[in-house]
Structure formats: C-alpha cells, structure tokens
C-alpha cells in the first residue's frame, strides 16, 4: 500500500502501535489519501478488527463545519476507544477544526448520547481518516495543521489482479 516506501511503512507501524496504548503519546490526525482501489479500506478494516471494541467509526459529518448540533452525540461513542476512523469524506467537506482538535488533543469534551445526560469525555482515540480528497480546513489554524499527517497510498490494485479475499485473509 505504501509503494515500498520504508519510511511510510514504519510510520504506519508506529501509528498502529499508538492505538494499542491507553494514553495518547502524540496528537495525530492521520489522513490516508489515494485514488481508490489502493488498500486504504482494507488497512482500516484490518486494524479495526484487531482493536475490536477499542475502536469506533464516525460519520464524515462528525467533523464537518456545517454540522448544526452544539453538543454532538456522535463523539460520545469515543469513550474508552483508542482509534476513531472516518471514511470517504465528500469532496466539498469543510473540516470543523475545533471538533477535530478536541478529539485529537485529549482535552476534556462535553458529550452525551441521544436523549441522555451530558458527561465529560476524555478522548484518547487516535484519529484515522481515509479519503480520496483532502478536505478544506482553515489555513490559519496552526494547531490543527500541527497535528495533521498525510500518507498517500500510491499503488492502485485495481490495475492488477486484486485478491478479493485479502480482507478475510488478514483477519
């Protein structure tokens, strides 16, 4: 998936290792970017399988600046999680950098499940976002961009004979 780039392979291993820890050694928002058919989804599904109940999937709207809710209930599902994944961002999505920094920064957030009481959430999840397009974010938000890591998935497997059972094999 990395096209043989040893540095990217090592970084993916380090990131996966971070998801095994109860604390968060670094504030990282990892974007996996590629044109499709490049292994992003297989990689994410594999790490989600390994982590089991320690991972959660968020909708792309969770980090959208057009979201209307003042206290989002979707981040409540991050309680006790070590990995939060988001897949397939729309091309025109504008990132709510405050929300993303809140998830990735480790500061206590106010959260609630739908129709339930508010509670304090101390997010520990690493944020992993797979997309074909890098979303727009306020270019002046230095704290957001300090956290962002971009990893390109340059190999397209649809040009070759793809292993249709690879996801199952990796489990």
Write out the residue ranges for each language-model feature.
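P-loop NTPase catalytic core of nucleic-acid-dependent motor ATPases
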Residues: 1-79, 149-151
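AAA+/SF3 P-loop NTPase mechanochemical coupling elements
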Residues: 73-80, 111-130
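Conserved AAA+/SF3 P-loop NTPase catalytic/coupling segment centered on the Walker-B
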Residues: 80-106, 119, 137-144
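Conserved nucleotide-binding/hydrolysis micro-motifs of P-loop NTPases
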Residues: 90-91, 132-136, 154-159
């Amino acid at each position: 998936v990395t096209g043989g780039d040893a540095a990217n392979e090592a970084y993916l291993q380090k990131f996966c290792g971070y998801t095994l820890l109860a604390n968060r050694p670094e504030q990282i928002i990892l974007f996996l970017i590629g044109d499709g058919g490049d292994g992003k989804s297989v990689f994410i599904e594999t790490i989600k399988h390994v982590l089991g109940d320690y991972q959660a999937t968020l909708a792309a709207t969770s980090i959208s600046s057009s979201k209307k809710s003042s206290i989002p209930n979707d981040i409540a599902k991050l309680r006790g999680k070590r990995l939060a994944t988001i897949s397939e961002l729309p091309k025109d999505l504008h990132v709510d950098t405050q929300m993303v920094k809140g998830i990735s920064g480790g500061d206590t957030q106010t959260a609630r499940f739908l129709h339930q009481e508010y509670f304090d959430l101390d997010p520990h999840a690493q944020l992993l976002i797979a997309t074909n397009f890098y979303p727009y974010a306020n270019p002046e938000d230095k704290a957001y961009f300090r956290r962002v890591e971009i990893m390109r998935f340059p190999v397209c497997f649809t040009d070759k004979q793809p292993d249709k059972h690879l996801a199952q094999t990796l489990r």
